[in-house]
Amino acid sequence: GQGIISIAATIGMASLKNNLFFKQAEVHGMSQRGGAVQSHFRLSDKEIASDLIPMGAADIILSVEPMESLRYLPFLSETGWLVTNTRPFVNIPNYPELAEIIKEIEKHPNHIALDADQIAQEIGAARSSNIVMLGAASPFIQIPFECLEDGIRKIFGAKGEDVVNANLKALHAGKQFSDSKK
């Protein structure tokens, strides 16, 4: 629903172009009923044995929902980057105050927090907030940006040129946001 699988597929496509090894695992936590979808994505220039990321070993947590970003923080390495959307997906009673969640996110020294939904709407690509998030994470992914663009073209190509262009625009908008914050 929120595009985590499309993000992972795009990175996977981009990593193939760079002759990198990758393994991906998805966990669908009752996603049909509003639960979280989590995707572990490991990328390396060497062979990878396991598709799951050990606690404290992730270089990036890319989250399309702010509270979910905090849930997976134990996976992040000390030097890793937390890249998260600030627009909540309120699907539970007693959702915590957004200001408190943002305060917790800001405690992490390496973080990028953006309202990807608003950015996607502003650029006329309202359904591409997930790709705005991928663009925001792109400076921290060890793959050339052009390869992510090619991944977008391959993943969304069958949906037509308008969809591809909207997602490319979203990718660029997210990268531009992160570049302005570094």
Where are these predicted regions, by residue range?
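Active-site cofactor/cluster-binding pocket
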Residues: 1-182
